[in-house]
Structure formats: structure tokens, C-alpha cells
């Protein structure tokens, strides 16, 4: 009664009753089916009440607007007059119900914060381009220049800017010109900084991710070309040129700027320009704007269907369809927009193979079933329709069906759908139904009306399709979010169509009756009927629209009555006959399409990891069958891919180059082995042997075997020589009777009676008798010197030539060096320049991208078999027409006997013929679920470097091509080219579901049935479809109208089942593979040459830096093959305090610090990494050098989670202790002393023996 709610005073606290309240009486629970009926009735009454309110609005005044809502401007005096009249009747008119119930729908939504900001900034810096009085696009002023899209025709709505002479840049689809000086102060600023996130434009938020700008679908359209995209500071980051719909979002074609201020254009595939160009349609040789047709369906249905059929291939068909179903002057609710198209159609009856008892003509025949999403939903296409009442008006949760020519309706909750168990019906739209069903091998739909149960079943394997790497059967409550494909629960236009056409004639025997012994035909009210009779040798064929008797015919079997209808479409089903003559066809949008979404996937229990020496043991406990994939981060990945269903243990080897495993849906984990082993390389022989046996088992066994062999040979040779010498010494005395052997000879058993020649006499003898031996003896000392030199060189750590050359070349003003191509590992060096202090340079690659040049060959996806309604000719023959559609097959079958729900279709039994046609087209879900075949070519390399030169740091992106320089703080840096042209991508690659596969796909036009590429499209939206599916038509069954066929299974589906793991899990060198664009990141392969051009301003004079007068280096702790496991302490005395660069010229050690702070006297601690057991390196501090050396021990941890930050040039060699024991075994100082004693004894024996004989 009142337009406002009264305010009542607060009620006092209720009186507390000391007596207990009686128990609440029990009532039986309501029947849930009854509750659903009540809810459906309530919803219907609400809809009816709402329509009545819209049809007869109250005469009272409009609702009183709140203070926050801005009053709308009144247009026209007539509107003001009505407003005044309403004020006069305010007292007597009924209250406005919308005010009481709240404003549920705002006609003018207030712009958001982003839109308001952009509108404010655009007011003086963006100018519309007018064409024939309409806004065709926009021009904006950025950085003192005018930019307008080249494809936008028209004149800028500003006299000054319109008079400017522009230059064209066709590469970027832009025209530009310098604006006058007085306008430059009020222009946009541009920026190349585009971190991932959200930006703003005229229609709200724009998402920037992976180098692409996207907006929600439906935001932005023709006429928005030239609008700027702004960041939070009001700077222009891009200019919009067009867009393309990609599922639930629209990708924008933009022009932006890179780091160098150079214009860059990004255009997604199949992008269309967003200039407001009017699309023209055709009607009876007269063109008209597709959005403004001269007729509409509600007024002229038959003519409207003919108009749509004539423009079915026109690019503006969607605009024409939208305008044709909404007549001018009629406005409907937004919810009706989803259902209005299907009022052009009607349900039909079709043959179902499996009804309740055998086959039948069912009102709910199932045409197709699809379940390709990852959410467990099923999309059905049936002969019945949903969301419409029998008259074609909107009625939610309702199914209408054709029951022998009469369209009836039933609430949707009375329709059941089940597989192995009942399904949950989500929604329906047109011929399509969306439901969630449990697993099963068939799907059945049924309903009961007037004690009659109608059902239809089709064989189809319904199963849950998990996404990710764990084969779960039900969506989990918790887990990780992963990209997936789900069926959209709405009927928005997503670019897929289903083909319609005018229905053929339907036999209806109920229209034929006998009246007074004569055949009488009564067509339904408002429709026509075709009557064909064979009576007394007379053939009758006549179209009637009212009851008519045929005096020549006395039996009902002599006549056939066919229903005719030319103002409704039906689905182009193979279960319906085709209309005679040229069929008017059309197309409507398919609802509930696959769309990109996010699914919750389970996470398998984390594996229990046990580390060993160069090994990892994984103890796995999967909840579902889970994939385990591993690879080595080396040149040969040696990947493994295994599905694990039971608890198990897997052991893997890990190298110093790295190893990666991916368990289920968990992120990848990487491990690196360290050079650890038991024993002590600096201990006793058995400790040394144990240490090296664990590190190098084969080399240790080989070395010990050689040593044992040498010792054995030496002992055997010594024994043999001793025996031989003894026998030679004793023989002369044995041959002499009563000979007495001297005591010393008896002890040593060896003596020589001859006098030794001098060295000169020996050389004289060789010169006179054997000069070759003379020269050989002279060359022996030289050979020994060469051998000793080579042994010393092999046993000592010598700096390689390239390192020496690099250190020598570092003194140049233009500095050149080479760093490893490994992300995250710092490379430090210094520049020595005469008269200046060493300048430290530190370079850390943060990200390295390898982007190949790709060429899209074709796109492949699931195919759909299209079948035309068969053309049936009674009592006659016919021929196939030429075929033009992909893989189209046409065949004529004679002797058919078609039968419909209304009776036999033809009079003849065997003279009838049927033309069956079938062809191949892409699936409705091809836009969301498809694979793209690319050919990859030469790759470009980009490196994101964190560079520090002296005290100046910057982060910049460098093109590693050896040509493109980068300038920062006066330093000019040129990188590349990469030392190797390696790429993880083969010549042929396939992109599917955000992953890349190396796959040798067939060329375009050479696809084979059942294999990848059986259908091929140049782009997802193109019409040049190639198909080869081995489609063969079969003879139709007698008594039925259908088009049977056989066909090879989908090659795309088979490839998805058989495909190997993607490059994300199998690429060598630890590459990380991404898409949009296709690229490989952080591949640890090769090296990057760097050339610096350093200005004088960055150098410091030597006189301004400290000078060390004394320095001593001590290794406090040293662990080799570990991440900065060495600690060196340098005690020094400096001339003054200051900052000095530190560097190791050789590759023996890698320093963590690039510079240190020095006092006049003290010590400094430096951390380093080394792979040497006995590191000995020269440490440069400022201009002074100090030598650091010591012993290193193996690391304690077998496996670590990060790579080693030291040079791999010098691996851990054999320790000095081991060399000492080895040389002691084979020789050394003790052996030399023994040999000396033996020689002294021999000399003494010789002297004594010679004296005895004399």
C-alpha cells in the first residue's frame, strides 16, 4: 500500500516462561517429486506475473530514484509530457513494484573505475573517425604523433588533425603524422613496460599474459579499432586494431612498442579488423544492411526463412539472423536471447533403434551424444526441443516434442536420463540437452505421458575424462588448478552451427478417413496437405488446405496424405526425408560448446625420496594410476614414462648435469649429484682406494690391475735375473777342480773378471763398428728429457691457452668474453686497463629464450559426419548430383521401402529409390579441442641478462645474434651468436593443449584414414577442409528411413591416446617448453660470446684505489664440487681503505664476490667454488696478486637441488697423496736409495774380485 517500508520501534525483551515449551510436533517429510512440482508451478506463476506486468504497466508515477543514481536526461517533449501526467496521478496510481522489490536490473550500468579513468584520459587525446555520420574507428595522439589505423576509412572529427598529411606504414596497419606544437603538451605517453596483469581500455579491463592481450568474449567489437590500452599511470601500452573470438575470451590484435621504442605488431590467427564496415545481405537481387532486414520472422515466416537460406554463407549471417528473429519495435528480455533462434524450428519424430520394445518412431530420438570435456558432462542432440512451449514461446525447464504431428510439452523434471545410473539434467536449449551422467556403455532417455512410456537408447560409452597426469574417476574437493576443457553451461554464440532445412513431407494416415463410402482428407487447421491417390487407374496429386472428398477413391489404402509446412525448419537428419525440389537450408548456433576452463585435479601423495651416491630412490604411493616421467638434463635425456598404479619403489641414477622427475600433477623437481664418496683421498692407501672406487670404479679397477701386473712382472723378472746371475757366477768354479770361491763372491754369487771400459773407449768402439747405435745412444738423454717434460705437464695443472688469451685480451678498452649459456649462474670477470683499476663485470642470465620461426601447415581435430536427409523418389529412379563437400559420398539405392510414423511413404514396394549422401565436416568443438601442425625453421635467441659493470646495474633483454647492440649507462653490449645452432624442436612439431610434440605429421592434402591429419584445415575458422576418413555408404534397411555408413575412427582421437610425452618432459639440456609463442627457455647448451664497449667514465684511476703491500692467502675450508664450498681468508696491508675488484684469472675457482671492501690493514673472507681436489690459483685483488692453495675434501651431501656454480673445465683429479703412494709403489726416493746401494755393492764386489785374481 505504501511505496516505502514503515519503521517500527524495537520490541522489548520477551518474557521468560518458567515452564518448558511443548515439543515441536512431527510432520512427515514432503515428497521431493511434489516439491519439484510446486517449485515449477511457482516459477511458472512468477514468469506469467512478470509478463503481465510488462504487458500492462501501471499508470502510476515512475519509481523514485535514489540519490546515488544520476537522473537520465529526458529526450523530446512528449516524454516530458508523460512525466508531468504521471506526477498528477501519483496519488491514485498503484505503487511501482520494481521499487519495492529492489532494482534487479539496471538499464544504465555505472562505468567501473577502469572505464571512468580511461574515459577521462580519452576525452582530449582520442578522436573518432567519422564515416557517413557513424563512428568507424578512432585516432589517438601518442608521444607527439597522431596514430590512426590504416584500415579505418573516414575523416577525423577534428579539423586540425584531419588536415594533417599522414604517412602510411602498411607493415603495422597504421598511418601517422606529427601533431602541431600546441597540441603536443596534451598527448598520451607510451611505454614498453608490460608486466603480466590487467590493463585498462574503454570497455574495462584487459588481461596481458604470455605476450597477448585478451578481453572477455563480447567486450569490444567493430568500431573499436584505434582505441588505446592504458596502464595504471595513464600511459599507452598498445593500440587496438582488431580481435578474434577464442572460446570464452577475445584475443586482440594490437600495435605496441618494444624496449628500443620500435613499433611491434601482434596479430592472432583469424583476426578481423574492427572498423565499423556495414555488411550487406541480398534479398531478391536487392542489397540491404544485414542488421536491418526488410522482413522478420514474426510477420513473414516463410519469406524470412527463404531470406536466411539465400544468405547462409554471407559473413553477416549472424547479424541477419539476430535481426530477423527480433522484429523492429519489439524488445524482449535478455534471457530470451538465448532461445529466440530456435523458434524458427520445430521438433520431429524419428526412428530409434532401441525403444522400450524393439525399434520405433520416437518423439525423443537421440541423434548424437558427445562427452569430450573434462567435467563429466554429456551433450545430447535429440528430436525434441527444450526451453520452448508448443507455440514457440520461452518456457524454461520445459521439453516440447512431436507426437504424431501434434506438438506437446512436458516439464523437464519429468524427463529421465540414465546410463548405468540416473543422470542429472542441467539444462536444455533447442535440440540440445546438457546432463551429468555416471559411467556406462549406453544412454537412455525416457518420459511418461498418459500412462505411456516413451524411451530411446543409443550405445555410447560414457566415462569420466580426467585431465592431467593422474587418472582419477571423480573430481576432487581439493587439489591444484589446471587448464582443461569444459562444456559451457550457457547458449552463447560461440561460432559453431548445426544445419537446418525445410522438412520433407510427412505421411499422416490419420488425416485420411472414409465418409459415406468415399475417401476424405482433412488437413490440420492452418496447414496444408499434399494428397496423392491411385484410384481406378487415375493418379491424383493435389495440395489442399481444407477438408476434401475424392469421389474416385473408396478405400483408405488408395490415398496418401502428406503434411506440408514451409514456415519451420527442422534439423537436417538422416532419419527424415528431404523435401522435394531445392531445399531451403539454414544454420543455427550450437549451445553448450567446449570452452577453456580451470579444473581441480588431485595431487598424489608426495614420494618419499632417499638419496644415495649418484642415485635417487623414490617410494611411491599413488591414490589413482599416476604417471611418473623422468629425464636427464644432458644432451641425451634418456626419458622414462611409466603409469604406476600400485605402491612401488623406483631407483634412478643422477649425474652432475642434473636429473628431473615429474610425479603426477606435482611440479617438476630437479636434482644434481655431487662428487661425494666414502674414504679419504688424502689418507692411507686403503682409504684412497675406497674413495676412488666409489667415484670411478672402472678406472680404479683398471689402475689397480695395471699396478698389480707391474709388481708381479717386476718380482718375476727380479727372481729370474737373480737365478740367472747366480748360475753364471758359480759355473766357472764348478768346472775348476778344487777351486776356492772368494767370500764376497760366495755371498753375492756374481763377479766379473774383465775390466770395464771407459766412456770414451765405448764411444770409440761404437763409432768404429756401429755408428747407428752411436747416434741412438746420443739421442737417449734427449728422449728422456722430452718424456720427463711431458710427464710433468700431465701431472701439473696448466692454464689452457684460451684462458691465457682471454686474460691477456682483458686489458683492452673493448672487452670480449664468453659466458656459459646457463640461466641462474653468474659469470664474473674483470677488465684490466693500463693506468686504471680493474673494472669488475658480473653477468647473470635470468632467462634465455629460443624462439623458432614456425609456419602453420594445418589444423586437425575431431570430424563430424554430416548426412543429408535422404532424397526418396517413389516409383521412379534418380541420379546423384556432383559432390563438392569434403570426403562426400553419394549413392543411389533401388528397391527401398521407406516407412514413417504416419504409414508407408510410397505406394510402390520395390520401384522406389533413395539417394544417400554423407560428407565430413569439422566438429562443433574444433575451436576448443584441436591440434596445430607447424614446420619449424631457424630459431632466434633472446637473453634476459642482469648485468653489473662496476657499480652500475641493469636488467635488459639481448638478442643473441651478434648484431643487435644494447646500450645502458654508456656501455654498449653485443651478444652472440650462440656457439651452437642446436634447437629442441624438430622440423615438424605439433601443438596441442598448450604442449609441444615433435611429430612427423603428413603433409597437407596427404592425410590417411584413422591417422593424424585425416581432416585438415588451414585455420580453425577456414572453410577449406580436406578429409580422408574412408567413408562408405551402406544399403538402408527396409522399412526405415536412414543413411547407414561405415567410417574409420578419428585419427585425432587415436593420436591423443598414442602420443608420447611432450617436449616439456623429454627435451634435452633441461629445456622448458612454452607456447604463445612457441619457445624453449633456459636450455643449458653452448656459450654466448659477449663484446663490451666501455666508456672512460666507468674506469677509476689506479691512484684512487688501494694498493696491497703484503698479502697472504689461507684456505680455511674447502669442499670441492660444491656450491661455494671453499672459504679463503686473505690477510693484507693496504695503502688506504677502499673498494677493490676480486677475480681469479684461471678457471680453477669461481668466486662468489665480485668486489670487497678493504681497510688499511686486516683480513677479508672470500667464498669460492672449485672442482679441483688440490686447488692452486692466483687471486687478483685490485692490481695485486696472491696465491691460494690447499687440499679440498669431498662434499657430504650426495644430491642437491641446485646446479654447481663452478667451471666444469677442471674436474676433480687424482689427489697428490694417491700419486705419492702410486709412485712409491712403482718407484721413488726409496727405490733410488736401494738401487744406489745395489750399485755400490756391485762396484765393491767387482773391485775385490779383480784384486783377488790379480
Swiss-Prot record:
InterPro entries: Alpha_E1_glycop, Alpha_E2_glycop, Alpha_E3_glycop, Alphavir_E2_A, Alphavir_E2_B, Alphavir_E2_C, Flavivir/Alphavir_Ig-like_sf, Glycoprot_cen/dimer_sf. Residues 275-702, 757-768, 812-1224 are extracellular. Gene3D superfamilies: 1.10.287.2230, 2.60.40.350, Alphavirus E2 glycoprotein, A domain, Alphavirus E2 glycoprotein, domain B, Alphavirus E2 glycoprotein, domain C, Tick-borne Encephalitis virus Glycoprotein, domain 1, Trypsin-like serine proteases. Residues 275-286 are annotated as: Functions as an uncleaved signal peptide for the precursor of protein E3/E2. A lipid is attached at residues 729, 749-750 (S-palmitoyl cysteine). Residues 76-91, 103-117 have a biased composition (Basic residues). It catalyses: Autocatalytic release of the core protein from the N-terminus of the togavirus structural polyprotein by hydrolysis of a -Trp-|-Ser- bond. One of its GO terms (biological process) is fusion of virus membrane with host endosome membrane. Glycans are attached at residues 47, 285, 545, 651, 946, 1082. The record marks 199, 232 as: Involved in dimerization of the capsid protein. Its EC number is 3.4.21.90. It is an enzyme of class 3 (hydrolase). Residues 33-68 are annotated as: Host transcription inhibition. Residues 724-728 are annotated as: Interaction with the capsid protein. The modification Phosphothreonine is found at residues 92, 107, 126. Residues 724-756, 790, 1246-1254 are cytoplasmic. The record marks 274-275, 333-334, 756-757, 812-813 as: Cleavage. Belongs to the New World alphaviruses that can cause fatal encephalitis. Structural polyprotein: Translated from a subgenomic RNA synthesized during togavirus replication. This is Structural polyprotein.
